[in-house]
Amino acid sequence: MKVPQLRKKSEIKSCHNVTWEDNYSWIHQKDILEVLKDKNKLNPEVREYLEQENSFAEFHLKDTKNLQKKLFNEIKGRIKLDDESLPYIDHSYEYWTKTTAKGNYSIKLRKKINTNLVEEIWNGDKEKEKLNVEYFGVGDLEVSHNDKYLAYSLDTKGSEYYTIFIRDIITKEIITKKITDTSGSITFSIDDKYIFYSKLDENHRARKIFRHKIGNFSDEDELIFEEKSEAFTVSIGLSSDEKYYFISTSDHNTSEQYYFKVNEEKPTPKLVIKRERGILYSINSWDKKFYNHTNKNAEDFKIDISNSLENQDWQPFVAAKDEVLIGGCIFLNNWIIRSETSNALDKLFVRNISQNIEEELVFTDEAVSVPNISLRQKDKNTDEIYVGYSSPKTPSRVYQYNLSNKSKKLVKEQEIPSGHNPDDYIVERVDYKSHDGRIVPLTITRHKKTKIDGSANLLLYGYGSYGNSMSPGFSSTRLSLIDRNIIWATAHIRGGMEKGMRWWKEGKLTNKKNTFEDYIYAAKYLIDNNYSSKGKLIGMGGSAGGLLMGAVVNKVPN
């Protein structure tokens, strides 16, 4: 079968005093966002070429049909299809979700506390069937504070333009029928008379915040905030103490926030701190104080505290640390919980407010793991939370943990129906030197029977973009490779934030080559230390990681 050929049409382009020939710029459609909404608007010649590429790939993979089926069944066999989440107590109800073997979408359930009557308030498969659509993506599912309304957003075309609906949970009546072209995010007002949402512009950017009165037509919605810069996007959220709404506007490097009180009849957002190029900040309020998570004079962030936003008197709460990324806070009446990331490992810390004592939460002796935390209930007057962790060899485990007496109880463990023994696997964290001497973390997972003599095949995964960190958590799909003596290695290369903001900055823009070199030196380390050998390495990277793959195979094809 011949390799598909795309028509060439020469066009000379220039930028920054560099001129080049581009044979394929004709592919770009100016109305590409319209194509996302309606796939029939795709250039027919491009569609035909893509179909040829699909046929070409299928032709060359035809001998692997049985293997594909076997792998599919293996991976499916590790997924518990009939499953339920842990409950979350919100006012007078417990809410949770479940999945079933027969369905493709989740079901949201609730029951009144101290009763056994379970209500189904959302069923994705039934909703998709009612709409009779091919594509069905759920953006947000939010229940009102009074437990009366369910607001949800749907994308039925794969365009990531979401339409919002609001339904009366008891009567099933659609109260608000359609708010189109939104980002999908929904926030209820405290009195449950309104929702706040962001509208997408023609360039798919959220730059406007609207207030919608439940039951009204969307053309009556009130614009309460508009971002003038095309480079920034906006969002809105409720503070932890439920006394303020904060509107956040930001690009990747700079942010700004506005606030208004929840009881304002006509919301008038007030500026918190004027934007300053390169400065990120995020304000939250709790117990009559305001907390500012910011990188101002703190490359890897810090947390400051103030008694007022009108007369700001910021004082240190959590100091900055070199190459330690300081995360935000979760607030309870007696406790403040926060996170840190350093050397590609996450940590959780809990502070006793009355004693002003902080300590790390540790739930496993595994050297490489990913901790997580979630609240059991909306009421903050509690000492109990959910704390969990996973690792490259250990599926997720969640404990109900009492912060006061430090007792814990295992309440949910990710089940692998086909069976899984963590002791069959070995996880290593090693460091290697890159081209400029910087030390890069590398997480390696292998079966205990796999030999370290250069004979094993090895998949080296990399991303290194947008400040996204590759946390070393559990993945059941990887086991199909690892069980076949293929070593899985994740290089925590620059461009992510595994070692703080500087790690990101050293792998972006004019420093992007560091991302590529870090990956190449990871491959060299793995070969030099007999994890694999030349000709046995598999490179993997998707999305922005695709740029990485293109760069490294051209730079060092051997």
Place the predicted regions along the sequence by residue.
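Beta-propeller folds
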Residues: 1-384, 388-396, 400-405, 421, ...
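Cap/lid segment of the alpha/beta-hydrolase catalytic domain
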Residues: 126-141, 153-159, 173, 364, ...
